[in-house]
Amino acid sequence: MKNSILKQIFVIGAGTIINVLIGIITVPIITRIVSPEIYGQFTIFDTYASVAVLVLCLGFDQALVRFYYVEDSSNYKSTLFYNCVKYPIILSTVLLIVLSILTFLNIIDIDFDNSITFLLFVYIFLQLLLRFSTLVIRLEQNSKLFSFVNVSQRVNYLVILFFIFRFLNVDKLLALVLSISLACLISLIFGLIFQKNIWNHLEIEKDNF
């Protein structure tokens, strides 16, 4: 048991270290390709998304952690996950649709043009789903998959970014935003594939709640 815990800590720690090393190596390269102004806008984009996800979770991510081990059955965990994720999804969908309409009607201004603003809303939604997906992976103590998803997101972001820079003639801020959004989507797909027993909620046993 002790060796298993240490192994999981080591795997997660190794994934974190790899992510940090990738960041240390690639950030200076990216900042040489794009101007500080554009990279600053991208940082604001990412910050907006991170704050929005924290708010839109409504604390249900903590509720998932709190009640996940109450029962060990897959049906209970799937039902719990469904009940924790559905309200943030509903709220975020409604809110992002409303904000999209208000933005495109120029009623509110979110500091970006329409294409970047649209991608911001898409990215927020993807990040929200990914947050719950990776949380379940961690709660299932699947340290290898957890590290794989985190590292692959960073690697996919860089691969997609350099592909866009090399072969597509698009705005550099748009390239950064597209890359991070697609990388998030790919990581989410990995989570859906490997945790499909949790996501495939066919019947809800309301008696459990």
Placement of each model-derived feature along the sequence:
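Interhelical loop/hinge segments that connect adjacent transmembrane helices in multipass membrane
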Residues: 1-5, 144, 169-177, 189-209
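Transmembrane-helix boundary and interhelical linker motifs in polytopic inner-membrane proteins
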Residues: 2-4, 34-38, 52-86, 138-144
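Signature of the first transmembrane helix
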Residues: 4-61, 123, 158
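Membrane-interface junctions at transmembrane-helix termini in multi-pass inner-membrane proteins
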Residues: 6, 126-149
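Alpha-helical transmembrane segments of multi-pass membrane transport and lipid-handling proteins
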Residues: 17, 56, 62, 82-109, ...
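Alpha-helical transmembrane segments of multi-pass membrane transporters
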Residues: 20-28, 94-99, 150-171, 186-191
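Membrane-interface helix-loop junctions in multi-pass transport and translocation proteins
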Residues: 31-41, 111-112, 140-145, 155-187
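Alpha-helical transmembrane segments of multi-pass membrane proteins
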Residues: 51, 55, 89-93, 109-133, ...
